[in-house]
Amino acid sequence: MDIRKTFLDYFQSKGHKLVPSSPLVPDDPTLMFTNAGMVQFKNIFTGEAPIPNPPRATSSQTCLRAGGKHNDLDNVGYTARHHTLFEMLGNFSFADYFKEDAIAYAWEFVTDEKYLDLPVEKIWVTVHDSDDEAYDIWKKYISEDRIMRFGDKDNFWQMGDTGPCGPCSEIFYDQGAEHFHSEEDVMGGEGDRFLEIWNLVFMQYERDEKGTLNPLPKPSIDTGMGLERVVAIKEGVFNNYHSSLFMPFLEKIGELVGKPYDFDAPNSASYRVIADHLRSVSFLLAQGVNFDKEGRGYVLRRIMRRAIRHGYLLGLREPFMYKLVDTLVDLMGKQYDYLASRAEAIKTSMKMEEERFFETIEAGIKLFNEELKNTQDVFNGEVAFKLYDTFGFPLDLTEDMLREKNIRLDIDAFNKKMEAQKAQSKANWKGTGDAATTGDFKLLKEEFNTNEFVGYETQEVTTKVLALLDENFKKTDAINGKGWVLLEKTPFYAESGGQVGDKGKLEIRNEKLEIRVLDTKKFLDMNLSEVEGKLSVGDEVKAVVDPSRVEIEKHHSATHLLHAGLRAILGDHIAQAGSLNDDKRLRFDFSHPKAMTAEEIEKVEAWVNDKISRAIPRKTEIMSVDEAKKAGAMALFGEKYGNEVRVVSMGDASIELCGGTHVDNTAQIGLFMITKESGVSAGVRRIEAICGRAAVEKVKALREELSQIKEEVKNQNPIAGIAKLKEQIKTLKSEVASAMSASQKELSTVNVNGVNVIVEEVQTGDIKSMIDDVKNKYDNVAVMLFQKKGDKVLLAAGSKNTPIKAGDWIKAIAPIVGGGGGGRPDFAQAGGKDASRITTALEEAKVYLSEILEGGN
């Protein structure tokens, strides 16, 4: 039985629209990862987005919980039901049906023989202790002795401190008293006997800033059912990891380890940890998240290194995780086709991270074990920091290792060592000043919903000022300075998809006033332009886009061709990881395991210029996401696409989902030049390039530089001129070396009580090198050299196997020439201001030597 398909088909038959799983990286600045099925519908529930048609949806959403409020990482592998990545089946009602239908649907799906067909006597439900309505509905289906009431902790759900919220009802499956005997194996306990399989959230209130619950005029439904748990129940196993969703991983790990998986073995948890983490790491990599030192990339690294460490415990000493990717593709590639298309890129990134950690893990574990010998109850926080900072052990990996030994960590000492270092993982992902969560954008959204973007067709339009916000994003009737404007129709493109926001001007009709448009951004699906000038609500204006848009479009279209060119030259594993397109340059980040060679860069550049020279018309079509995928369009994870998408193609060269503006024909791009290729992070490369006017300016600048080089080398063939100069430099270096050698040969050596002594003034050469050569030549020697530099003097001393200490010698002699200095016993140097005193200094240096070597001191 395909439970995922059965669930989705059931709710589609009930009028729900099938919505695809949204990315694990949500379009929400307050979340690090998508952790529930309702995340992609959040704006609908809060009223910031309109209710769709139909007003009900169903989905199978991949979710990740590895930090913050919902953090299952510590339990993964050690319990039967916890995972970092899991699939949440859900049905949603947006001000449509409510408790009666939600409970009826759930009961039918759980118990009807056409669907899950679970025994009625095994089903228990919970409701909020104040929710008599839900209690009375459930009485129609199940005996009252199996309806339990609990308080806010267990049966009340809220999105945040304020906003939509409400009681919830959870459906539990009793796995049988004969299998579970813990005190926690009761309803409401933490045991595994009563397994929660479905949560029905009744969003019927809105909590205000005072904490008061106000009834919503149109309540909604949000439900979530864990696919992994239901599959285990239907397959008659009492551990999610023993279901068909995980056993193939455990079997493959057994092959790699050389020991089959055995649940009763002491190390069985390590098999389960690896199986779970393989899924989450693969999905994150496939969706464009890369290993990093902070943010989402650091969470990815934590999960990966936790899995590697468990492989180490099983005896694995070389990369192994990447060898499990094919098993994942076999199991989940049909539902999530991007896993198959990006499998090689996933393997490459995994293997690189494994190689990196395997280089340090053994030394780190050795340090950990050594410190453990000196530990009774509390592990040294400074050592934990060293494991983190030097050996790449994430903090929670060290805590995981300590938990196995029942030892706690001195976290205060660890935090002190961290000091000003940036926190590597945060409970909540913080965006860059998300103004939409603090300003009056919601008021504009409620009043106007959206505004019309006409910038694809024209760069100039007569329109009206619908609303204004001041610099603090507060609604106002007029501005005289900086602020934000919402136009009824706008030709200004709002920053998104890597393309910068448009600039330009507003001209007020019948007035000789121009208002500068500084930037354009999107807030709650509204294009707002930042302006500077005097403007009032209701003003009729002429909106004109800055001519720089033409160059921006060239760079954006060139980016599409560059993406296609990289895939053509380097391979299909190339996936976009970020981009920037403005009027002067483009920047493109992409997944690739190593630096590009000069030959590869040249080939990609030539590929793009070839497509430009073919004058390929740009074509734009609106189609469904499925149609776009069938057409071969490349989509980006993290980008928010609606039911219909805009597909931009340039013949067979490039086809991508894109909302940006582009040239009409590739020939308009002009010359394309790659200016730099560099690394961004592990497995991510960056290309910087220019085209159009910027490329022409670059060629002019290079031509001028070439002219200057010709002038400097006095040769119209600069390559030949430079070669000649290099030969001259080589000759001069040889002459200098000969002069230095001759100078060294002229040094006069005197033997004083068996010690070779040299005290002289030299005219040329590097006196430090000379002293090194002298020390290499003799078994014992004391040497001091002086060299005149204009009115000043340099002096240096060396000693090898003699009673003379070079530092003391220099300190005694340097003041004679108006200087000071010092150094080691074997070498010291100084500078002096009075070169006229060199002769005196030479004599005093010899006297100093004689006194020591002849026993006078």
Curated annotation (Swiss-Prot):
It is found in: Cytoplasm. Zn(2+) binds at residues 556, 560, 658, 662. It holds the Pfam family tRNA_SAD. GO terms for molecular function: alanine-tRNA ligase activity; aminoacyl-tRNA deacylase activity; ATP binding; tRNA binding; zinc ion binding. Its EC number is 6.1.1.7. It is an enzyme of class 6 (ligase). The keyword Ligase applies. It comes from the Bacteria. Its main location: cytoplasm. It catalyses: tRNA(Ala) + L-alanine + ATP = L-alanyl-tRNA(Ala) + AMP + diphosphate. InterPro entries: aa-tRNA-synth_II/BPL/LPL, Ala-tRNA-lgiase_IIc, Ala-tRNA-ligase_IIc_anticod-bd, Ala-tRNA-synth_IIc_core, Ala-tRNA-synth_IIc_N, Ala-tRNA_ligase, Ala_tRNA_ligase_euk/bac, DHHA1_dom. Keywords: Aminoacyl-tRNA synthetase, ATP-binding, Cytoplasm, Ligase, Metal-binding, Nucleotide-binding, Protein biosynthesis, RNA-binding, tRNA-binding, Zinc. NCBIfam families: alaS. PANTHER family: ALANINE--TRNA LIGASE, CYTOPLASMIC, ALANYL-TRNA SYNTHETASE. Catalyzes the attachment of alanine to tRNA(Ala) in a two-step reaction: alanine is first activated by ATP to form Ala-AMP and then transferred to the acceptor end of tRNA(Ala). Also edits incorrectly charged Ser-tRNA(Ala) and Gly-tRNA(Ala) via its editing domain. Belongs to the class-II aminoacyl-tRNA synthetase family. Consists of three domains; the N-terminal catalytic domain, the editing domain and the C-terminal C-Ala domain. The editing domain removes incorrectly charged amino acids, while the C-Ala domain, along with tRNA(Ala), serves as a bridge to cooperatively bring together the editing and aminoacylation centers thus stimulating deacylation of misacylated tRNAs. This is Alanine--tRNA ligase. The gene is alaS.
